[in-house]
Amino acid sequence: MAPKLLLHGCCAHCTAYSFKYWQEQGFAVSVYWYNPNIHPFMEHQSRLEAMRKLSAEMGFELITEPSYHMAEYFKNVSANVDGRCRICFDMRLGQTAAYAAGHGYEYFSSSLFISPHQKHQDAVCSAEALAKETGVRFAYADLRKRYSDSRHITKPLDLYRQQYCGCVYSEYERFGKPNSPA
């Protein structure tokens, strides 16, 4: 029987190749959606709907966290805006590892590790610490060189494609005026 891996899905585009990769490595993969960093709420819903479509297309089990946890996210990151990415990784991967521990998964990972736009090493450090804390093994692969492969999988599916990481800070960094105050 294949070992069970819970893959945190940050978005449909990054999840597509990540799911395929871990499945090819011999894991029974389920995808977990928990992303309280994505704002505004309708952006979160658009990305979740894209993930549901991808799940139907690729045939994976999609587990969604029923609570959005927006207030908790802002409470955690507002105290340390410069360190927000690590805090965000701790929240999302922490929830994933905890779910994995409570539901019989031997491993966890994330589609974050395919994105060239994430603070990769911070995400790795977060996942490694959470593996020690929860006892669930962290399955790691640096998939950043395969990012375009994921896009090739999802482009024909005409899924919603986001323009920023998800948080309002990244949205401002992407679209805000260069000299305007934050």
UniProtKB/Swiss-Prot annotation:
It comes from the Bacteria. [4Fe-4S] cluster binds at residues 10-11, 85, 88. Disulfide bonds join 165-167. The keyword Disulfide bond applies. Its EC number is 1.17.99.6. It catalyses: epoxyqueuosine(34) in tRNA + AH2 = queuosine(34) in tRNA + A + H2O. Pathway: tRNA modification; tRNA-queuosine biosynthesis. HAMAP family: QueH (MF_02089). Belongs to the QueH family. Catalyzes the conversion of epoxyqueuosine (oQ) to queuosine (Q), which is a hypermodified base found in the wobble positions of tRNA(Asp), tRNA(Asn), tRNA(His) and tRNA(Tyr). This is Epoxyqueuosine reductase QueH. It comes from Dehalococcoides mccartyi (strain ATCC BAA-2266 / KCTC 15142 / 195) (Dehalococcoides ethenogenes (strain 195)). The lineage of its organism: Bacteria, Bacillati, Chloroflexota, Dehalococcoidia, Dehalococcoidales.
